[in-house]
Regions:
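Short, non-ligating residues that shape and space the ligands of small metal-coordination modules
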Residues: 59-63, 109-115
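Short Cys/His-rich Zn2+-coordinating modules
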Residues: 28-43, 81-89
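Short, flexible, mixed-charge glycine/proline-rich loop motifs
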Residues: 37-50, 91-97
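Short cysteine/histidine-rich metal-coordination sites, predominantly Zn2+-binding motifs
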Residues: 67-78, 118-126
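C-terminal/domain-terminus segments
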Residues: 2-8, 113-147
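Short Fe-S-cluster ligation motifs
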Residues: 80-97, 134-139, 143
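N-terminal alpha-helical interaction blocks
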Residues: 1-36
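Short cysteine-rich clusters marking metal-coordination/redox-active sites
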Residues: 53-56, 103-106
Length: 147
């Protein structure tokens, strides 16, 4: 069973941003701007990656997963571990996950990927239950130019 859907990878944007930093067009202070909440989330909820920080090259990056969804309530907008993501996926309808890489030494941070988890929303039936055809006339379903 595939859990992640609608995956968006931001690797090209990352490469482009790093090229700007390495060429001097973008300052290091502009990309090393992780706020304290993100750094704290990296410490307690993050997963250590195998990738070294592209800016300071002093430590491995930490991956932090953030969840967002209207029906998540207080959980929305918080960092979650991989185990918590699996649990949330079984309990809630669709919600989005944003994975951010962060360096706890120099505060580099960048969105790595985003995807959707949770039970897929059920599609609405195209025909009424029971298989009978609708008795609506064409005019009832028609739209006017002002709509």
């Amino acid at each position: 069973m595939r859990l992640q859907r609608q995956v968006v990878d931001y690797a090209l944007r990352r490469r482009s941003l790093l090229a700007e930093v390495y060429s001097g067009r973008t300052g290091v202070s502009e990309v090393c701007d992780a706020n304290p909440y993100l750094l704290r989330a990296a410490k307690f909820h993050g997963k250590l990656s195998t990738v070294m920080c592209p800016i300071c090259r002093k430590e491995q990056l930490t991956l932090v997963s953030w969840v967002f969804g209207d029906h998540l309530g207080a959980v929305s907008g918080s960092a979650r571990t991989a185990e918590e993501l699996v649990l949330l996926a079984t309990r809630f309808e669709e919600f989005s996950v944003h994975v951010v890489e962060v360096c706890r030494t120099c505060s580099w941070n960048h969105l790595v990927k985003s995807y959707v988890l949770g039970a897929a929303r059920k599609a609405r039936p195209t025909r009424p239950p029971g298989g009978s055809r609708s008795t609506r006339t064409a005019r009832d379903g028609a739209r006017t130019a002002s709509e």
